Amino acid sequence: MTISQHRFRSNANASIISMLQRFSDILIIFLGIYFSCFINDYFFNLHYVLMALVALVVFQMIGGITDFYRSWRGVEFSVELILILKNWSLSFLLTLGFVTLFSDFDLTFRTFIFWYLAVCAGFVVTRPLIRALAGFFRRIGYNKRRVAFAGSLPAGISLLETFRKQPWLGFEVKGIYEDSFSGTYDLELYAGKISDLINEARKGTIDRIYIAMHMRDEVAIKNMVSQLTDTTCSVLYIPDVFTFNILQSRTEEINGVPVVPLFDSPLNGINMVFKRLEDIIVSSLILILISPILLVIATAVKTTSKGPVIFRQVRYGMDGKPIKVWKFRSMTVMENDDKVIQATKNDIRVTKVGKFLRSTSLDELPQFFNVLFGQMSVVGPRPHAVSHNEQYRSLIQGYMLRHKVKPGITGLAQINGWRGETDTLEKMEKRIEYDLLYIRGWSIWLDLKIIFLTVFKGFINKSAY
């Protein structure tokens, strides 16, 4: 097979996979509404076809914005599935709003929910099947990419090992090329010098080259890239940014200029919309459910000690902006935010009712109003006293990065036991470690998991005084 034939076959198969994805998505959306009408005894007519068309147009538009129909080769299935479910959820909500405002369709809410869930189920079933089909063709030689690595940065070695351990991805690793063996990987992976790599690329025996070299090797990188312009290889650069404790590993393009965020919030674009919807829905439902409890607690606080029912504390919110956080008053003496003394075991300032509220986290229930008003999130790093921020930002590297998202009522640190008094630097460091881990790995599913586990792990804690 000639070089051109190989490249044509690879690209053709990639296009076929993309077409399969689009066709299956169209089919699922239409079959979903048909199934929903059938289950709920509605006659399927042109009106519902038009509704499905609206949903499909919106879904395709959002897919274009989120670049959903790109190649998912090498990306975990969970990432692909989460994005398609996000796209469909937003498309469904927009379609529902459009239908409610501009039409008189008589579909019940139950029918709409059936449609939404049926399409979700369809995506969950078909996406793995398409992946499995693509993996099968790659195993037998179709849609494969012959890849090589220039340099041996740890990030490059990690990517290489992923390709070797997961052959269904369709990457055939030729080896690592560098002018001298660095000794950071198995000798069998060493394929030659950079000049050998360039020669192989010119012969057409390599489809893709990953440059995994230090930024200090700028001259060598430029020289190599210049010579690779005389080939038809795809050349990709693995940024040497993983030496930083980065929050987000993604790339952006601004007016044609590629940028790599080092410290940025994961809540951009559609993620921000979904996070806010999550907060509004969850906080509203919880406030409705706990309204009798709020009334009982407010009465107990008011009748057992002098002072207001609600205690408002100044805390740092998203981007370090001050917010006022609501809590049920649990002390006889108010804290001064300029000089905060943390509550300790047997603290005489804590009332009898307050002791129970603090040990069960019930004193924090009014913060769901903060969530509803947009100052906080249900899930996020817990807000610290202003004086603590000023103290620990100089002691713990990356402390202020926790303010790249809204503070939360519960968080990853809390369900892992890092809640209550932080009387040592080590305890605070551990809490910050979990806060940053949450920001790096944020997803709607992680939020839901934390909310679920909070019910069992996050409320009762002996270290909360």
Swiss-Prot record:
Its main location: membrane. Keywords: Capsule biogenesis/degradation, Cell inner membrane, Cell membrane, Exopolysaccharide synthesis, Glycosyltransferase, Lipopolysaccharide biosynthesis, Membrane, Transferase, Transmembrane, Transmembrane helix. Pfam families: Bac_transf, CoA_binding_3. Its EC number is 2.7.8.31. It comes from the Bacteria. PANTHER family: COLANIC BIOSYNTHESIS UDP-GLUCOSE LIPID CARRIER TRANSFERASE, UDP-GLUCOSE:UNDECAPRENYL-PHOSPHATE GLUCOSE-1-PHOSPHATE TRANSFERASE. This is UDP-glucose:undecaprenyl-phosphate glucose-1-phosphate transferase. It comes from Klebsiella pneumoniae.
